Amino acid sequence: MTNVQKTHPLMKIVNNAFIDLPAPSNISSWWNFGSLLGICLVLQILTGLFLAMHYTSDTTTAFSSVTHICRDVNYGWIIRYMHANGASMFFICLFMHVGRGLYYGSYIFLETWNIGVVLLFTTMATAFMGYVLPWGQMSFWGATVITNLLSAIPYIGTNLVEWIWGGFSVDKATLTRFFAFHFILPFIIAAITMVHLLFLHETGSNNPTGISSDMDKIPFHPYYTIKDILGALLLILVLMLLVLFAPDLLGDPDNYAPANPLNTPLTIKPEWYFLFAYAILRSIPNKLGGVLALVLSILILVLMPLLHTSKQRSMMFRPISQCLFWILVADLLTLTWIGGQPVEHPYIIIGQLASIMYFLLILVLMPTASTIGNNLLEW
């Protein structure tokens, strides 16, 4: 009798990717975040689909349609808050996933890493457009401020912004197109994720030691399927704690006021997961300079393979690099805090120092520490 699992064209793909996949025997819980991101994506697509059934992308009715979802639709409130807080969980998993890649040298897999950076940018674009849809005060002003940054591009900037707006300000046309893009992008993300996995399965997973694990592989199922299920349960636990006990903890109170172009909020800020980049943007007094720093703060990830000077792949046995890595994490937390503060003393100078530190750590200090580590081991 033939094994359908190994002969059927579709089942064969599933089998080779999730069942009989040879995986390193020593990958830790830091390797759980890939599957958690997949779960987050599916959850966001499903909750988003049900929200889209009741949402209207018109400036006059968008805000009230979200209110209608929360008040009148059966379990609409839980779908709405699962979607909003699901985005936060998505980004927590994303940051952990990228951090794991940086710490253990996963960026040596060039194709997988670069596709991952593309995924990060796409997810950030999707989340930004999603934040505009409820058409609250922070939605409107966030959209105005962030899209306006494109006007810093020489020659074509102003035309580009008006083209994206579909007029001379953020208005009905902007909201409609943002809804269209916000709906389609998660499916594009899912497609790019398939390519991400395709490239990963060409090389196999990295592991904490950073050395080849070809001589010590175990099947993905049941060992890592059960481990991923545990991770998924913990993710859903944290998400439901947020949704049911503190649904507005990570949101902005200003977004409960309908968008008003005549009234500017005291501090305009994006969602918490963009605050680190927003702080870097604000720390530079020049508009174009700020925009470049903002883009580079994420795009710098592409340079990681070039900045890898160590003879070892992972940071597991590199204490100096480890210290700098955790300083970088602390620096990003500082930037996140600063991004949510008003532009005044002492926040301005703290933000500027943290921004300088961010680029200094990645571009100078960490490669230098790796070289020192090589010399200490007389390599």
From Swiss-Prot:
Keywords: Electron transport, Heme, Iron, Membrane, Metal-binding, Mitochondrion, Mitochondrion inner membrane, Respiratory chain, Transmembrane, Transmembrane helix, Transport, Ubiquinone. One of its GO terms (molecular function) is metal ion binding. GO terms for cellular component: mitochondrial inner membrane; respiratory chain complex III. One of its GO terms (biological process) is mitochondrial electron transport, ubiquinol to cytochrome c. A ubiquinone binds at H201. It comes from the Eukaryota. PROSITE patterns: CYTB_CTER, CYTB_NTER. Pfam families: Cytochrom_B_C, Cytochrome_B. Component of the ubiquinol-cytochrome c reductase complex (complex III or cytochrome b-c1 complex) that is part of the mitochondrial respiratory chain. The b-c1 complex mediates electron transfer from ubiquinol to cytochrome c. Contributes to the generation of a proton gradient across the mitochondrial membrane that is then used for ATP synthesis. PANTHER family: CYTOCHROME B. This is Cytochrome b. It comes from Kobus ellipsiprymnus. The lineage of its organism: Eukaryota, Metazoa, Chordata, Craniata, Vertebrata.
